[in-house]
Amino acid sequence: MNQEVMNLFNPQVPAQHFDSIRISIASPEKILSWSYGEIKKPETINYRTFKPERDGLFCARIFGPIKDYECLCGKYKRMKYKGIICEKCGVEVTLSRVRRERMGHIELAAPVAHIWFLKSLPSRISTLLDMTLKDVERVLYFENYIVTEPGLTSLKQNQLLSEEEYMIAVDEFGEDQFTAMIGAEAIYEMLASMNLEKIAGDLRAELAETTSDLKQKKFMKRLKIVENFMESGNRPEWMIMKVVPVIPPDLRPLVPLDGGRFATSDLNDLYRRVINRNNRLKRLIELRAPGIIIRNEKRMLQESVDALFDNGRRGRVITGANKRPLKSLSDMLKGKQGRFRQNLLGKRVDYSGRSVIVTGPELKLHQCGLPKKMALELFKPFIYARLDAKGYSSTVKQAKKLVEKEKPEVWDILDEVIREHPVLLNRAPTLHRLGIQAFEPMLVEGKAIQLHPLVCTAFNADFDGDQMAVHVPLSLEAQLEARVLMMSTNNILHPANGHPIIVPSQDMVLGLYYLSIMNQNEPGEGMAFSDIGELHHALENKVVTLHAKIRGRFKTVDADGKPVSKIHETTPGRMLIGELLPKNVNVPFDTCNQEMTKKNISKMIDTVYRHCGQKDTVIFCDRIMQLGFSHACRAGISFGKDDMVIPDSKVKIVGDTEALVKEYEQQYNDGLITQGEKYNKVVDAWGKATEKVAEEMMARIKAVEFDPETGRQKPMNSIYMMSHSGARGSPNQMRQLGGMRGLMAKPSGEIIETPIISNFKEGLTVNEYFNSTHGARKGLADTALKTANSGYLTRRLVDVAQDCIVNSVDCGTDKGLTMTAIVDAGQIVASIGARILGRTALDDIDNPVTGENIVKAGTLIDEADVAIIEKAGIQSVRIRSALTCEVQIGVCGVCYGRDLARGTPVNMGEAVGVIAAQSIGEPGTQLTMRTFHLGGTANVVDQSFLEASYEGTIQIKNRNILRNSEGVLIAMGRNMSVTILDERGVERSSQRVAYGSKIFVDDGDKVKRGQRLAEWDPYTRPMMTEVEGTVHFEDLVDGLSVLEATDESTGITKRQVIDWRSTPRGSDLKPAIIIKDASGAVAKLSRGGEARFHLSVDAILSVEPGSKVSQGDVLARSPLESAKTKDITGGLPRVAELFEARRPKDHAIIAEIDGTIRLGRDYKNKRRVMIEPAEDGVEPVEYLIPKGKPFHLQEGDYIEKGEYILDGNPAPHDILAIKGVEALASYLVNEIQEVYRLQGVVINDKHIEVIVRQMLQKVEITDAGDSQYIVGDNVDRIEMEDMNDRLIEEGKKPAYGEPVLLGITKASLQTPSFISAASFQETTKVLTEAAIAGKTDTLQGLKENVIVGRLIPAGTGGTMTQIRRIATSRDDLILEERRKGTGAGSANQMLQDMTDQVPAAE
């Protein structure tokens, strides 16, 4: 690799155009071929003359001259002696920059092992030799001898001998009967004598025979390394070095400081160490020193070479004079400060400046204000050129003088230069691509950059002291791209969700909202206006106010573009907004004839963009901004203490709640409820009280009041206006100002039982203030951590998806995903329309009633189609998705669908992976960090009942219902669901019903929307009996498995099951409740099996032994408070957990087959659950379940594939294995979306799908067929498909594999490109693996290309590459033809053929 990278920077060797980079282990011959000479002395430079010492680390003879074209002794100077080697000092006369590329070497007196191959786990040397790492180290570091050739003695091959044992063996067998060696020589001999082909054959044979999993893994690891060596042409003994390369001196400089001291690179220290020890070792060997001394010196040499390559990897870190660890070669590459991330992936640029930003409301959307001083500095070269061209100056020096004096002509020229020359503005942190946009600069006085207010959302900028950087695109192409792609007017929509991002905010919203308010009894109410001019006239003369109800004629155009007018009931304010709307039949006056909240403004801009195009939208946005600002100013909305309204009923609500809480305390004291239940109920009660106070407050604020004297409607409350319009503040904040602050959380996340009753207007008491500081400080600490975590998540996402580019128009697959609306607790949270908008239909979509076609297969679904689909009541639509796209590299345009930032089908070469990563990572800072500890609040309230979300007929699936003694229907099934069908029999909604719920409807009942279907106790999970009889206890031994707990404060006893396995005596117990029938035998259940109900830990018994029970009665209840207080990972950690595909802590166990539950013999603390398969020929599956977990299945229950045997969060790997890719995709998409939805962030599903596609690129071989693979190998899906195509062609058996889900970090490290992986994480490990396998990087992703300094293969770069490739192949063809002399005819024909291949999309 080095030679090729050297060529990149070497002016004398023209940089060859290369298509790929290969990395492999350097053989000693290769190292010598790079080298220009051996370094024999540890000296660097002579401290008096400052000239480099000969044969030292900076030797000019080896590395080249210090000054350009001048030898060291000064005999030859200047260009004319170029290439001559001075006979006196031996230095070649050439450029001094060769000191950046010429390498040297050190001949080692004894071989040493390369630490990367030794210590980078798994250790390659030890795996290859089939020894443990510890043993290899003992040999290498001279602790043990190893037998390399046992001869006829009783010693074994590779046996380790200590010094004593070796001596004894020599005495016993004689020195020439066997060979035992020590140190790197021994390992070198062993590696050199390996026959790789034979080893590979043996390993394959053993693999086929062995049955043990462990051995298989071990053999596979070894086989992989052996095959890597065979395929790459590397030799194993190259992992032991006899020659150490020395990097060029200018890459490890020695800089003189003032005061005669030197600053040096750490590498020089490390090299000096190696050279010193090497020279000492040579001398010792010449002097024939005793073996022990030589061995010690060899060990030290090994250690010093280790430190040079990777300091601190083994043994102590070598430190410099100031006790700071020395930076080794590995450290130069690693981490944020390493070569990859510091210098190759991001470089500093020239022609840039930064300054504070201020608002520029008089700018147009595509402009920014650039301070004159800054512009003068940034555009200097252009100004010099102009001055020269216009004849103001004849030399650069003169031009410089003119500019420095700031002559008037300079300013005129600056104006010319700047005109139509866009500049890029960037605000750090650049979280998504809208963080850098292009503007046309306008020169402004002062020193601050002026920014257009509408682009603030995209930059996430405000004017409280933010700074921004300006960059000047220099080349014509760069200017073109800036104008066409990055101009702020071309970025109206948000790439994450396709909503407009150029939306007025804050003051503008407030002004527009104020304009659009409609009040009653205003002066001029009921007037009619014929046109807008008349209206302006009336407003100027105060005949009518902005908020009066009037009738006005609004002029617009019809479908043919002819002017039409229509009379609307509206207000003058709304007419003013309507005046700005572009005239279009699809943008009627109704779009603005409503209260202009931020949401409605966004919808209005969206409508204008979809129907009138970009130019009109930009003009409209600019005008609407002006209008908003001017009316916000005129409205004079202020914020006073009296605007915070405290509801009169607050005192009563608080009093009632306090009484309720007292009652709960009493119930607890009477022993009716447990401590946990009391806490939950109290927290609930206060939560409800806070809501109620807030509702009352909102009602007071919203109330319409009239002035008794004038009869006019009183002006609206200003705080309410700000919050309701979406300008600033939320109902939650209003609640804290005027209602009550409510419950607070401790830093641990638990909720404190005593709420804060005061609000900020009344002021908090000392205790309340103290209680509220907890949560507030936690919030600040979280924010600081969040930024770093969110940034790291974005980095991993970008890294995994960076090579996902739109590479072809259509892959023609017939696979896709099924999209349905997402319903949560009966509410539709994401409609089907929103989910399929901008995606490609996989099948024809027909109206289910009329059967007419709505959308043809393979067409993009747009807004109009969505409206028809939703109206037709279609429940599910199959669409194309990036997940199922079958393009080999990247994705195809049809599967991806619409480019959200443009609203058109996606372009070829769009880097959709990076866009996806940014869209998911950018809102990361808005997500919460905390894991929620659920102390009962809202959760419980949500989940205690089911309501019908539609009208229709009930259908109960898997019906299993009993009537209990009170005559109520009880759900006894584990997997029952209540479905609502509409009048056409189409399923509208389906909801699971929890076991033990009371059900209020039955099959065939008609229900209205909002009717209650079922309810259950949210605090406990019941265990119910299906048979009647008498209760008997089994293995419920006092003090061992059941505890009669007497609550100290109440004196009431209750019986609770305790963990019986904690004592040796209780280990064989199986606590259960048995129901016996009249004859005294154990009653039989309807599905076979006995009525024996096993109890889980913490169950509270509800019956006494001997009592009678009937069907549907509760025997025991398990409190769910244990489940309620468990952490739910939310926010950022949850998103990271899903993308990293980690197994959740208490993960669910999912049934792999359909079948019947059978309980096997229990182990000590695990319970055996078997599923007896429903179909023949399938093996039964066994699961082990920890005994303390609430397990609610009984013997004989029927269970379907994919159902939960044990509740919890499922592990994504299980979903993939059991239910397949589509189920996994929908699970991941929904779970990730849920987290973002809670924060109100909208992200399109396709972004998450692109990332999940990247996580699913590998397959695990289940059947190798006739391929090279081994069962259990992880290989690239594409690679396997290619291999299979070849095998099938040859008539052999193809290989089969199961898809494997990798977390994003793992997927990034396993990309085909080693350059990309190395620059991500674990640099040494990645490079070690790549070198052994002799990997080739074909430079397909974005990152690799940036690192080698090319245009990325996306966007314009991709097109250029493609054109260049076609051009080169044409040239080759023509040359070929010329060589053959076949004339031009056939060449032209071939060219024609090739022209047809160029994709049309370019």
Curated annotation (Swiss-Prot):
Mg(2+) binds at residues 462, 464, 466. Zn(2+) 1 binds at residues 71, 73, 86, 89. InterPro entries: DNA-dir_RpoC_beta_prime, DNA-dir_RpoC_beta_prime_bact, RNA_pol_asu, RNA_pol_N, RNA_pol_Rpb1_1, RNA_pol_Rpb1_3, RNA_pol_Rpb1_3_sf, RNA_pol_Rpb1_4. One of its GO terms (molecular function) is zinc ion binding. It comes from the Bacteria. CDD domains: RNAP_beta'_C (cd02655), RNAP_beta'_N (cd01609). GO terms for cellular component: DNA-directed RNA polymerase complex. Its cofactor is Mg(2+); Zn(2+). Binds 1 Mg(2+) ion per subunit. Binds 2 Zn(2+) ions per subunit. Transmembrane segments: none annotated. Residues 1379-1402 are annotated as: Disordered. Disulfide bonds: none annotated. The keyword Protein biosynthesis does not apply. DNA-dependent RNA polymerase catalyzes the transcription of DNA into RNA using the four ribonucleoside triphosphates as substrates. This is DNA-directed RNA polymerase subunit beta'. It comes from Agrobacterium fabrum (strain C58 / ATCC 33970) (Agrobacterium tumefaciens (strain C58)).
